A protein has these predicted regions:
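N-terminal secretory signal peptides and thylakoid transit peptides that target proteins
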Residues: 1-18
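Segments of small-molecule ligand-sensing domains
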Residues: 295-312, 316-378, 385
């Protein structure tokens, strides 16, 4: 749905024939619908959290400019998770009970997502997780990044079509990787006639990858898949310093990481729902608005635009999808919103985007890109939309 269609649908809501477009004073006077942003605004993930905050405001400003939601303006209420599960739970409860937010978004870590869900169960509110995930399904959850099923199979299919048949994997030793990611990787590699030579499980906090890289070099795989969640920058830098020959591939890929690796990412192939290089009017408008919004900050640049993180686009997408579903349902109540989500299709920066039948995950194109020397990603292929698979 484009902005014109969204504006037209916004004419019909709780105010009947009176709308924000006709009577803007009514919208200004109406009590706002609050959106809760629960993000890491301090600590190592501050930039991710701040990007989510800015992108949430972009979505809210756009919706308010089109007349608001159900005849009421949207307003953002913000809390810092401090990257702590206990703090996230406390702040989620504050947003839900004190601020009476209609939904929660902005979380980066899976532990933050789980804490937000725990709090949301009491208040019966929607949690929108703006990150890729293992395929987590819950009646109160919408994930706006790609699930494992939407990442692994398309990337392995594309790689093995190009001749890569032997794979070594280096992954963070977390439960979702053991239960979902690596089994999906094994299945996809086997399905296409390849071999998964070994999986190297690394605990969070690992900073020296030398021994693992030496063992991989001795095995001589054609592909090395990495899912290092806590410090991919150090891993990629060491991978290049060892002059590794296998093609490096990953499901943790975006322009900001390429910049942080100071050229070491060049040539790596990644999979994501969003890259800045998507050439569409919607994406260019989004990047231009974001760049203007952060003009007074030290946000890194890539060409004419401030660097966008995929988490930010996922946050923007989640609020847009929530607002359209609530508008269609005539309510912000979670069950009504979840039911309406499955019928939605919006043009977003990533492209045309819908939601799975259960309302748990987005359905959009899976983008395969290759990091370039200028830190951009060249789009190699777009696959899908691929249906997600629930993993609990």
């Amino acid at each position: 749905m484009n902005r014109r269609d969204f504006s037209r649908s916004a004419l019909w809501g709780a105010l009947g024939v009176f709308s924000a477009a006709v009577c803007p004073n009514l919208v200004r006077a109406a009590a706002p619908i609050k959106i809760g942003l629960l993000a890491p605004l301090s600590g190592p993930l501050t930039r991710v959290g701040e990007t989510n905050r800015h992108c949430a405001m972009l979505a809210i400003e756009e919706i308010n400019a089109a007349g608001g939601l159900l005849g009421r303006p949207l307003e953002l209420a913000v809390e810092d998770t401090q990257m702590s599960t206990a703090v996230t739970l406390e702040k989620a409860r504050q947003l839900l009970m004190r601020d009476e937010v209609a939904m929660l978004t902005g979380m980066v870590l899976p532990s933050e997502r789980e804490a937000a869900l725990q709090a949301a169960k009491t208040a019966a509110r929607l949690v929108v997780y703006p990150n890729f995930d293992e395929g987590r399904c819950d009646p109160l959850l919408l994930s706006t990044g790609l699930s494992v099923a939407q990442r692994v199979e398309p990337l392995i299919t594309w790689l093995m079509r190009g001749g890569g048949k032997s794979v070594s994997a280096v992954v963070s030793d977390v439960g979702s990787n053991r239960k979902v990611l690596v089994p999906a990787l094994e299945t996809a590699v086997s399905r296409h006639g390849g071999r998964l030579l070994n999986v190297y499980w690394l605990p969070f906090g690992t900073r020296d990858y030398g021994a693992v890289l030496q063992r991989i070099a001795a095995q001589q795989p054609q592909l090395v898949w990495h899912s290092i969640g806590d410090d991919p920058v150090t891993f990629v830098k060491q991978y290049r310093s060892f002059a590794m020959r296998p093609q490096l591939v990953t499901d943790i890929a975006h322009e900001s990481l390429s910049i942080a690796t100071a050229g070491a990412s060049t040539g790596a192939i990644g999979v994501s729902s969003y890259f800045m290089s998507i050439d569409s009017a919607e994406n260019h408008r989004f990047l231009a608005r974001y760049t203007a919004r952060v003009a007074d900050t030290r946000a890194p640049r890539l060409g004419p635009y401030a660097v966008m993180l995929p988490h930010g686009e996922c946050t923007y997408a989640g609020i847009r999808l929530f607002a359209q579903a609530a508008q269609d349902a005539g309510s912000v109540e979670v069950m009504h919103v979840k039911t309406a989500l499955s019928g939605i299709s919006l043009n977003l920066p990533r492209g045309k985007t819908g939601v799975s039948r259960a309302g748990d995950h987005v359905t959009c194109m899976t983008r395969i890109g290759q990091a370039q020397a200028d830190n951009s990603f060249a789009l190699l292929d777009s696959v899908g939309p691929i249906l997600p698979t629930c993993q609990g």
